[in-house]
């Protein structure tokens, strides 16, 4: 439930996810947020019940690849495409390791203590 607008006006889903389908210099932000691209991202949130793993780059790289495949955003910086191409295998392995560490931490430090996340619709 956030976004980033870079200095060129490209509206990205996150400061670290350098992909966009629209630019605020060409379209109102309200319209951009209702685009199929942003709707697809919101439909997948939270990406995981474990709120320690909210990122579509580090924690759930498959989601970033799916969204890019479905909506064909343009990269907003040089090298952005490597996240959904060249680095896919390494990111998938890293995500598995992150889950191996953070899932038990989530269970122990949050679920076991009765924490129930309140999701924003």
Please annotate each region the language model reported.
Residues 5-6:
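Short, acidic, Ser/Thr-enriched surface-loop or helix-capping motifs
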Residues 16-121:
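Flexible mid-to-C-terminal extensions adjoining Fe-S/redox cofactors in radical SAM and related proteins
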Residues 1:
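Structured beta-strand/loop patches that form or line metal/cofactor-binding pockets in enzymes
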């Amino acid at each position: 439930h956030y976004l980033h607008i870079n200095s060129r006006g490209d509206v990205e889903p996150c400061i670290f996810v350098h992909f966009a389908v629209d630019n605020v210099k060409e379209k109102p932000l309200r319209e951009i947020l209702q685009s199929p691209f942003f709707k697809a991202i919101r439909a997948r949130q939270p990406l995981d019940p474990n709120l320690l793993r909210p990122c579509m780059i580090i924690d759930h790289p498959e989601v970033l690849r799916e969204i890019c495949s479905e909506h064909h955003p343009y990269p907003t910086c040089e090298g952005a495409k490597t996240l959904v191409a060249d680095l896919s295998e390494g990111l998938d392995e890293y995500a598995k390791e992150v889950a191996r560490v953070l899932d038990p931490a989530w269970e122990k430090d949050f679920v076991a203590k009765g924490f129930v996340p309140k999701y924003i619709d």
